[in-house]
């Protein structure tokens, strides 16, 4: 994630995906720290203020829903009860709400809203004209549609009493939808990849549909004294007047203009200040050859072994999940869904991705810890082993709990929340497992922190790099905490706000900066770059990235029941996130150049190539495909379609997964620098993994997503997610095309896992030598 160009008296840095900086002056380090801290404080102040507005203006949850004829349609607490039913069944892993979730089953908000609108239109058509709504004349239909839009968009929520008053026709529509969803969840649906008996309790089904009703009501009812709904008119539904808001269009334009201007400024800066590189400090021999591993460094080997196995298991779950999308409930005809339903395999697929990537990064941090202070802290190996056991407990315990929750093995109490499935994508694990993971991260912070604090007492030129390393470590450990900030009965909009703190800030924010610092340490240990110069680059890298990344969290919340202020800030600052990614080509070139600086660096060639792949996927997966869906007007039509999957695979695996593989390889190389690697196998795995991912995206996910987008724009969001569209011959063929890329990717992954495990279980001979010196 970092490459640096240096001169003796000044330094031009290409940092974090290609951003450039000209280093001059003796007070530069101090100024960079002030810049980073200012960005950090100001950005979180804005994000926090927007959060207070989100909480204040979240869609109200009615105390009860009552028809004008006095019938109580939804009694007290039934909507929140329904949200809990939805969560325990798998929540976002079985369809989506407000566009957030999985892709095979419908978006339940859009589906309920469309079915309700159709029912009302047909009910009125039969009553007034004696015929079905589909047979009305244009004039007759226009009259009823205008009436329908008035009905659906008028906000009849009584703030003083907490009641929502609805027309009796909406109560009849509710009962009709209840019957439909009862059939879906009781009998199962192959079109939706929902297993038979997913939910057969009639009481819970009524609660579930009450929750669906509320999300649909909030998506169409205008905010008080406004002409847009609580979700900024998402999802697209022409029948009820849900069209893009003016703010969505205006802020899209602003974000695009800002992006172009920022890229232009960066090109201007680079063209004016780029200098040649001085590599005179690179040693003639590998400084790691002959170094003795500390006990804690040896103890990290089992972490990398688990990384390999979890990576493989994630691929297996992905293969099964993809087949469910085509076959409905099986794998090549084998009916697995009654034992291992889609909602479980997809949960495990997404969660295992987070687990193995995080494990790789945590292990890399633990491996580097002795490098920081130059010695092995007391009981460090014991701490590393305890943390390993805790991580295994969280992984296995959370997976078992999720299966039990979905399969109704945890009873009717609250155990589903504490030990089962919370229903929120990427943070699906039960609260107990969440808390255990947080405690494990604090232990990891302690293990690394004591090494860093000891090193900070020494007067060396790498103190800023160590302090930055400690800060990013603290960020990773502490910023998982927002995942504990919501409760079992928390408002969905509030949950979404904190959830994206974890998914975006934790994974895409602090992991990104942590990776920059870790790689800086690794290259500094090899003496390819100087530690103080690396600190300059890493500090400015973090400042620039976080200036867009922190507030850019809000781009996930455009339509989650949030006010327009979230859309405005999110669109502008998410555009700034893209700017560094445009220059990743420079990073790739510099990484390759570093690998050729001395003959001995050739043994790091394929490690460096994995870093180059990170730069490539940063541009394509995070940059191109990220900005494809980030502008408000684009996300309005694309959210929750396969275009989202394109970005998710290209960014989460492409950037963070590839970086996890690269860090694993780097540590394994550093453990045995004198060992000869089977580079043919590693080269094959590298090309197969990356080509396979490209095939998966361009042969299947992207074409499906673009066709869905066209359908969403021309017909409505509900249609783009409907089985009538997704089960057409063209879409089915495109889904099967994914098998080509998946197969190539899986073969490459198998080769990588075999290569890595072979290194770990058959260690080469090492030459005894004194303990390594700290980074100079």
Language-model segments: which ranges?
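Post-cleavage N-terminal segment of exported redox proteins
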Residues: 27-75
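Hydrophobic cores of alpha-helical transmembrane segments in multi-pass integral membrane proteins
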Residues: 33-53, 86, 229, 246-273, ...
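Soluble extramembrane regions of membrane proteins in the secretory/endomembrane system
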Residues: 56-247
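Non-cytosolic membrane-interface motifs at loop->transmembrane helix junctions
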Residues: 423-431, 494-504, 562-573, 639-645
């Amino acid at each position: 994630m970092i490459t640096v160009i240096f001169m003796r008296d000044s330094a031009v840095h290409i940092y974090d995906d290609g951003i450039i900086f000209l280093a001059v002056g003796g007070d530069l380090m101090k100024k960079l720290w002030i810049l980073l801290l200012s960005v950090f404080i100001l950005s979180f102040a804005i994000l926090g203020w927007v959060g207070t507005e989100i909480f204040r203006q979240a869609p109200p949850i009615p105390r009860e829903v009552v028809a004008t004829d006095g019938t109580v349609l939804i009694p007290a607490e039934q909507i929140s009860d329904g949200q809990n039913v939805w969560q325990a069944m798998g929540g976002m892993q079985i369809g989506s709400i407000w566009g957030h979730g999985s892709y095979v089953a419908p978006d339940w908000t859009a589906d309920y809203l469309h079915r309700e609108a159709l029912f009302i239109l047909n009910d009125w058509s039969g009553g007034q004209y004696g015929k079905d709504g589909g047979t009305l004349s244009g004039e007759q239909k226009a009259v009823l549609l205008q009436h329908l839009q008035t009905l659906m968009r008028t906000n009849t929520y009584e703030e003083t009493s907490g009641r929502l008053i609805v027309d009796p026709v909406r109560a009849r529509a509710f009962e009709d939808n209840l019957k439909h969803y009862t059939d879906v969840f009781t009998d199962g649906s192959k079109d939706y990849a929902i297993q038979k008996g997913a939910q057969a309790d009639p009481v819970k089904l009524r609660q579930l549909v009450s929750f669906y009703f509320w999300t649909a009501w909030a998506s169409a009812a205008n905010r008080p004294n406004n002409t847009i709904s609580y979700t900024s008119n998402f999802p697209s539904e022409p029948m009820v007047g849900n069209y893009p808001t003016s703010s969505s269009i205006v802020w899209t334009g602003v974000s695009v203009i800002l992006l172009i201007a920022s890229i232009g400024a960066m090109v201007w800066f680079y063209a004016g200040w780029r200098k040649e590189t001085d590599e005179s400090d690179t040693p003639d021999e590998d400084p790691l050859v002959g170094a003795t591993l500390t006990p804690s460094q040896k103890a990290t080997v089992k972490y990398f072994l688990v990384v390999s196995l979890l990576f493989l298991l994630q691929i297996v779950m992905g293969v099964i999940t993809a087949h469910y999308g085509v076959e409905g409930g099986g794998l090549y005809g084998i009916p697995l869904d009654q034992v291992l339903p889609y909602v479980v395999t997809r949960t495990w697929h997404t969660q295992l991705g987070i687990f193995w990537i995080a494990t790789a990064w945590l292990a890399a941090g633990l491996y580097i810890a002795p490098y920081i202070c130059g010695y092995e802290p007391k009981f460090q190996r014991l701490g590393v082993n305890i943390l390993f056991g805790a991580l295994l407990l969280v992984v296995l315990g959370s997976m078992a709990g999720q299966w039990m929750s979905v399969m109704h093995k945890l009873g009717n109490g609250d155990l589903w929340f504490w030990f089962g499935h919370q229903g929120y994508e990427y943070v699906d694990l039960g609260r107990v497992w969440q808390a255990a993971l947080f405690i494990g991260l604090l232990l990891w912070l302690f293990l690394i922190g004591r090494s860093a604090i000891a090193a900070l007492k020494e007067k060396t030129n790498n103190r800023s790099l160590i302090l930055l390393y400690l800060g990013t470590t603290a960020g990773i450990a502490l910023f998982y905490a927002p995942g504990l900030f919501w409760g079992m009965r928390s408002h969905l909009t509030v949950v979404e706000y904190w959830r994206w703190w974890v998914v975006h800030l934790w994974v895409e924010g602090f992991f990104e900066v942590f990776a920059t610092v870790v790689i800086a340490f690794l290259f500094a240990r090899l003496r390819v770059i100087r530690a103080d110069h690396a600190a300059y680059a890493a500090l400015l890298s973090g400042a620039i990235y976080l200036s867009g990344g922190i507030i850019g969290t809000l781009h996930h919340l455009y339509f989650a029941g949030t006010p327009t202020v979230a859309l405005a800030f999110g669109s502008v600052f998410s555009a700034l996130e893209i700017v560094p990614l445009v220059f990743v080509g420079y990073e790739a070139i510099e990484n390759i150049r570093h690998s050729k600086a001395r003959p001995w660096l050739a043994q790091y060639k394929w490690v460096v190539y994995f870093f180059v792949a990170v730069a490539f996927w940063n541009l394509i997966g995070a940059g191109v495909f990220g900005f494809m869906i980030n502008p408000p007007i684009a996300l309005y039509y694309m959210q929750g379609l396969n275009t989202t999957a394109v970005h998710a695979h290209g960014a989460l695996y492409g950037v963070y997964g590839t970086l996890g593989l690269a860090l694993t390889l780097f540590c394994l190389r550093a453990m045995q620098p004198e060992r000869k690697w089977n580079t043919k196998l590693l080269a094959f795995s590298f090309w197969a993994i990356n080509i396979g991912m490209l095939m998966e995206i361009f042969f299947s996910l992207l074409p499906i997503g673009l066709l869905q987008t066209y359908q969403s724009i021309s017909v409505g969001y509900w249609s783009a997610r409907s089985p009538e569209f997704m089960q057409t011959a063209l879409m089915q063929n495109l889904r099967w095309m994914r098998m080509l890329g998946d197969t190539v990717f899986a073969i490459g992954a198998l080769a990588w896992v075999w290569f890595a495990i072979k290194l770990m279980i058959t260690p080469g001979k090492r030459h005894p030598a004194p303990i390594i010196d700290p980074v100079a």
